Amino acid sequence: MGVEWLVEKLQEHDITLNDKQKQQFQTYYELLVEWNEKMNLTSITDEEGVYLKHFYDSITAAFYIDMNQELSICDVGAGAGFPSIPLKIVFPQLKVTIVDSLNKRIQFLNHLADALDLRGVSVVHERAENFGNVRGDNRESYDIVTARAVARLSVLSELCLPLVKTGGHFIAMKSSKGEEELEEARFGIGVFGGRVEAVETFELPGDAGERQMIIIEKRSKTPKKYPRKAGTPNKSPLLK
């Protein structure tokens, strides 16, 4: 299982990869394994696992939201670049901003963007609470904000929804417990200006596990007092 497997699986969803994109994915895999020996980027390093559980899994967001247009995307807590870098490779017109609080991951992502010759990728070393506060230019400025298995949805909603422009979407990419998390997060989602538009449940190929994608539309502006100061959303999520 490698890049040709990815090509085949994406074609089932009318997504075609050219030679440059195939090479970008292969280089991505090689750099991920190389840098992972120096720093802990991922516990999944075998080729099959990376292509399935990182690359393919990241691109599933495009099965439910049309990415064939010029969109601004902010990826909160992207770690080794998931889901935003695979999406950027497949849809090069996307304008991507990645926010991560750990400097070593920022170093990797900057190197990766250069090595893959990606244009329109900005990597920011910052906590999401600070990035989305009322004093910055980033608040309510993105068409799509993504987060993939970073924290519970009740926490992520406070970090991500302030960054989404009205009419845009927050996409939370979760495992099989996404709907469970959604129940406790519903109150906060409403407070932050969001409305649950869809919950998409699907299986990864090869019985590799269930995934749930929670798509939240931004209906109104987030009150200025959110997000609260760094660390507070995680310690005391807004549940009711």
UniProtKB/Swiss-Prot annotation:
Q: What Gene Ontology terms describe where this protein resides (cellular component)? A: cytosol
Binding residue positions for S-adenosyl-L-methionine = 77, 82, 128-129, 148
Q: Where in the cell is it found?
A: Cytoplasm
UniProt KW keywords: Cytoplasm, Methyltransferase, rRNA processing, S-adenosyl-L-methionine, Transferase
Annotated Pfam families: GidB
Q: Which InterPro entries match?
A: rRNA_ssu_MeTfrase_G, SAM-dependent_MTases_sf
* GO molecular function, a single term: rRNA (guanine-N7-)-methyltransferase activity
The organism's place on the tree of life at top rank: Bacteria
Q: Where is this region: Disordered?
A: 217-240
The EC number(s) attached to this protein equal 2.1.1.-
Give the family this protein belongs to, as stated in its UniProt record.
Belongs to the methyltransferase superfamily. RNA methyltransferase RsmG family.
Q: What does this protein do?
A: Specifically methylates the N7 position of guanine in position 535 of 16S rRNA.
Q: List the HAMAP family.
A: 16SrRNA_methyltr_G
> Any idea what this protein is called?
Ribosomal RNA small subunit methyltransferase G
Q: Which organism is it from?
A: Staphylococcus carnosus (strain TM300)
